[in-house]
Amino acid sequence: MAIKKPAIFLDRDGVINDVIDRGENFFVYGKKVRWTAPFKFNEFKLKTGIAEILKLIGQSGFLRILVSNQPDITYGTMTLPEHEKIMAEVKKLPLDDIFICVHGRDDNCECKKPKPGMLFSAAEKHNIDLSSSYIIGDTQSDVSAGQAAGCATVLVDSIYNQDVTADIRIKNLADIIKII
C-alpha cells in the first residue's frame, strides 16, 4: 500500500486572492454580507507572492489542494463565464488539485464547507493523510470543515474573522512556511 501524503488544503477567497468589501448594506441570497468573493474578473486580485508561497509549500512535501465554496454562481451574483475567467488564472498557480462546490446553502450537499466532503474526496483521490494535513482558510466554515476531517486548522487573520478560533492564526499565507 502506498504511503499516505500530507496536504495543505487552501480556501480561495481571502487566502489566495483578496476579498471585496461591499459595504454595510449588501445582501446575497437574503443574507447581509460585507466581505465577498470577487463577482467579476476585474475584481479578482491574487495575493502578493502567492505563486512562490505555493511553490515553497510543495517543496516542503505537502500536496497543495484548493477547496473553495463558490455559491455565487448558484445565487446569480456571478456568471459562469466570469467564474471561468477567474478559475483560468487560479489554474496557472502551482496547485496539485482544485475542488469547487457551487451549491447554495439550501442545497444540503456534502461538499459545501463547513462539511468536509471536498477534503474527503481529495484524500481519497490523492491518498492523503488527513491527520498530518492542514486547512488554511479565513472563515468559520473553513475551520469547521478541517476539524470535521481531522486536519489542523489555520486561520488567515482578517478584520472579519476576529471571533473565529483555529489551531493556528497567521497574519498572511507566507507565515505558513515557518510552521510546516
Predicted segment positions?
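Active-site flanking residues adjacent to catalytic metal/cofactor-binding acidic residues
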Residues: L10-R12, S68, G137-D138
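Active-site loop signature of alpha/beta-hydrolase-fold enzymes
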Residues: V15-N17, I73, D142, N161
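Anionic group-transfer/hydrolysis microenvironments
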Residues: D13-V15, Q70-P71, K115
